[in-house]
A protein has these predicted regions:
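Small-residue-enriched alpha-helical segments and adjacent helix-cap loops
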Residues: 1-61, 67, 85-86
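A domain-level signal for the structural core that forms small-molecule/cofactor-binding pockets
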Residues: 31, 41-47, 106, 111-116, ...
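Hydrophobic alpha-helical scaffolding
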Residues: 58, 80-83, 129, 133
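Iron-sulfur cluster-binding cysteine motifs and their immediate structural context
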Residues: 61-80, 92-108
Length: 141
C-alpha cells in the first residue's frame, strides 16, 4: 500500500502546494511503531479474525486464547469468542487454531488529523476498517 500511496500522491500530486509538510505513516501492525495517529494521515494494517464456529472444537488449551496479546479471545461454553471491542486486529490468533477455525480478512485502519512537535495532537481513527484497498486509497485522496 505504501508504494501505491507514493506513486499516486507524491508523484501524482507533486505540483500541488500544501500549507505545510504533509506527513504520512504506514504501519503493518497495530503496535504503533510508526505513530500513525501522530501524522497528518496514518494507516495501520489490520488482520480481522473471523471465526467459523462449526470448526471450533472448544479445546481446553485453546491456541488462540494463549496467543492473544489483548485478552480478547476467551472460551465461553466450550466455544471460542473474540471480543471485537478489545481485539486490536493484530492477527496473531490467525493460524493458532489447530483446526483452522479462524481466518483473517485484511484491511486498513485510517487515522486523520494527527500532529507532532511542540503541540502534539492524536489523529482520529475513521469509524470503518477498510477491507478494499482501492476504497482506502479513494478515502485517502
Amino acid at each position: 500500500l505504501s508504494e501505491e500511496i507514493q506513486e499516486r500522491f507524491y508523484k501524482g500530486y507533486h505540483t500541488v502546494k500544501l500549507p505545510h509538510k504533509f506527513k504520512i505513516a504506514v504501519g503493518g501492525c497495530p503496535n504503533n511503531c510508526v505513530k500513525p495517529d501522530l501524522n497528518d494521515l496514518g494507516i495501520i494494517g489490520q488482520r480481522i479474525p473471523e471465526l467459523d464456529e462449526d470448526e471450533c472444537n472448544g479445546c481446553k488449551k485453546c491456541g488462540v486464547v494463549q496467543v492473544c496479546p489483548m485478552g480478547a479471545a476467551k472460551l465461553e461454553d466450550g466455544v471460542l469468542e473474540i471480543d471485537k471491542d478489545v481485539c486490536n486486529n493484530c492477527g496473531r490468533c490467525v493460524g493458532a487454531c489447530h483446526f483452522d477455525a479462524l481466518e483473517a480478512t485484511y484491511g486498513y485502519k485510517i487515522y486523520i488529523g494527527g500532529r507532532w512537535g511542540k503541540k502534539t495532537a492524536h489523529g482520529r481513527a475513521l469509524s470503518k476498517v477498510f477491507t478494499d484497498k482501492e476504497e482506502a486509497l479513494n478515502v485517502i485522496e
